[in-house]
Structure formats: structure tokens, C-alpha cells
């Protein structure tokens, strides 16, 4: 009963996700460009990851902490916004959804990004930090907090430097042109599309 509900809900969320034309999501900018492309071209492989227990656990922890932030810090949760950039003479939308946004006493936004991880080694991870920095740019915010929940600890890291627009344009170019695939050497090890990818690192 509960298992069926969780799996069905996860699949419905995945299938309802339709990418708009000339739109790049923040998460696309911090992962392998080929993986982003393959998720659209090989949907059957992408769907298989929907049922991973670790993904469902992450969703549940997100919902729980977002509820705590909403109830105790007056946070807005699942806040979406977008900004436009010019890449090669063409306008693209950079779209993102922050886990939560808290207003401080001065009315300024603090962007909260929640991450779950099996390990607490090497935190904060560079791609997570970059993601939050892009959110700071996207929401015109000066402060962000990266919250990690792992089996061994709960930790938060303050990020106060938005990514500059020139870097975001370069990341978007990589995503569009399939350059710098993968972005990080470790990505292939965990990628469902590695079985068909010519850029796989051995």
C-alpha cells in the first residue's frame, strides 16, 4: 500500500516533467551535458532510476526539512524563478527551484539548498556548491546555506558568493554543445547512460 503509493507518486512526478524549449535547468549546469541530453533521448533508461530507494529517501527528507523550515522560520518552499541569458546570439531561460528561501531581519533572501548523501567525506561537494551559487545569481541573493543530511552527521555551509553570469553562460554553452562531458570524473561511475556513452571515462 505505502510502497505502491510512493513509487506511483515518484513515477507521476517524473512523467509530468516536460522541458520547455530553450530552457536550461540549474541542475543541468552542474552535471554531465551528455546525461542531460540522454535523459530526453533514452527515456526508458531514465525512468529506471525513478524507483531507486535512495532517490525516494532523499525526497522524503527534503519534504520533512522543508516542513520544519516553513513552520519555524517562515520559509517559502519549492520557490521557482528564471532569468534569461544570451548564448551565441540566442536567448535561453535558466530556470531553477530553490528548496527554501528565508527572509532575514533586513528582508534579504537566504537561499536554502538541502542535500542528502551516503557519505560525509569531502563536504561541501563542488557541484552542490556551484548549484547554490547559481541559485544566488538566479534569485539575486547574497547568502545561501547548503544543508547536508548524511548517516554520520548533519552539517550546514554558508555560501556568500553568487556565480558570475559569464561562468553561467559558459556552463550553458557546454550543456548545449555537449562540451566537457562529463563535467566531473566520477559521474560515469554512477551514470545509467554509461552503457551507451562514447564519452565514458574508464
UniProtKB/Swiss-Prot annotation:
Its EC number is 3.1.12.1. [4Fe-4S] cluster binds at residues 32, 188, 191, 197. Changing residue 197 to A: Abolishes iron-sulfur (4Fe-4S) binding and exonuclease activity. Changing residue 148 to A: Nearly abolishes exonuclease activity. One of its GO terms (molecular function) is 4 iron, 4 sulfur cluster binding. Changing residue 32 to A: Abolishes iron-sulfur (4Fe-4S) binding and exonuclease activity. It comes from the Archaea. Mn(2+) binds at residues 62, 99, 113-114. CRISPR (clustered regularly interspaced short palindromic repeat) is an adaptive immune system that provides protection against mobile genetic elements (viruses, transposable elements and conjugative plasmids). CRISPR clusters contain sequences complementary to antecedent mobile elements and target invading nucleic acids. CRISPR clusters are transcribed and processed into CRISPR RNA (crRNA). This protein is a 5' to 3' partially processive exonuclease that cleaves off single mononucleotides. Has a marked preference for ssDNA, although in vitro it also acts on dsDNA and ssRNA. PANTHER family: CRISPR-ASSOCIATED EXONUCLEASE CAS4 (PTHR36531:SF2). Homodecamer, formed by the assembly of dimers into a decameric toroid, with the active sites oriented towards the central tunnel. This is CRISPR-associated exonuclease Cas4. The lineage of its organism: Archaea, Thermoproteota, Thermoprotei, Sulfolobales, Sulfolobaceae.
